[in-house]
A protein has these predicted regions:
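Structural signal for hydrophobic packing residues in well-ordered secondary-structure cores
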Residues: 40, 44-47, 83, 87, ...
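Short, hydrophobic/amphipathic alpha-helical packing segments
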Residues: 33-41, 76, 110
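A structural preference for short, pocket-lining loop segments at secondary-structure junctions
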Residues: 15-20, 36-63
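Conserved catalytic cores of soluble enzyme domains
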Residues: 60, 64-175
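N-terminal organellar transit peptides
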Residues: 4-7, 137-143, 150-161, 168-215
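STAS-typified acidic loop motif
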Residues: 9-34
Length: 215
């Protein structure tokens, strides 16, 4: 580790892997977004087809004027584009939320991987309920009530599994879990279908198919 930035290589079952991510609940600013993108691009250029494991522990995007002025939106979009490029070039990209995943720092990493997994004790949410209340103008009491029955409004790793955003939890033998993920994670986006099957997002897959059919 280099501060809050993780970068390295490993050999797993005789296969080299690229490891990249963050630690310490790192806020993702321009520096960290570009550093992760660099590792992904270097892997694509120098090691065709090598799997990439994204280790995710972030409090979300860096809320700082310095990063806003430097174009944090473009830096984070660049990171997401690099991960997408790696997938299109045949790299298996696996995300693992091992601690905390919030907001844009999660959207531009784990949610762009071939599949994202999590440890059972991980914390995942895109927006806190007080922030949802400010944005939607709905009272917190209503949002809290909705979160009891609707995974879309509720934080927690179990709700993201139900919605399909997290493909599954890694419990027990983590080596076996990684082995299975590298071998069986889908190349196509299965999140909407997983959400429908699990009851967390009942209409997303149907709406996607209607849009595709209309095109």
């Amino acid at each position: 580790a280099n501060g809050d930035f993780l970068e390295g290589h490993a050999v797993f079952d005789g296969q080299p892997l690229t490891i990249v991510g963050t630690t310490g609940h790192a806020p993702i600013g321009v520096r960290l977004a570009l550093a992760q993108a660099r590792v992904v691009l270097e892997t694509v250029g120098a090691h065709p087809g090598r799997p990439i494991v994204l280790l995710i522990d972030t409090q979300g995007q860096q809320l700082r004027r310095h990063d806003e002025l430097l174009g944090i939106n473009r830096a984070m979009a660049h990171l997401g584009t690099c991960i997408d490029l790696a997938r299109r070039r045949g790299h298996r990209v696996i995300g693992l939320v091992y601690d905390q995943a919030l907001s844009g720092g999660f959207i531009t990493s784990g949610l762009i991987a071939d599949a994202c997994y999590a440890l059972p004790e991980a914390e995942i949410r895109v927006m806190r309920i007080p922030a949802m209340s400010r944005i939607t103008k709905l009272p917190e009491s209503l949002l809290n009530a909705l979160s009891e029955s609707n995974p879309v409004f509720a934080p927690g790793v179990g709700n993201y599994v139900a919605m399909g955003g997290v493909r599954g939890l890694w419990q027990g033998d983590l080596q076996a879990a990684l082995r299975d993920a590298l071998a069986h994670s889908p190349r196509e986006d299965m999140r909407a279908l997983d959400g429908a099957e699990r009851g967390g997002r009942k209409l997303a897959a149907e709406v996607v198919q209607r849009v595709l059919a209309a095109g």
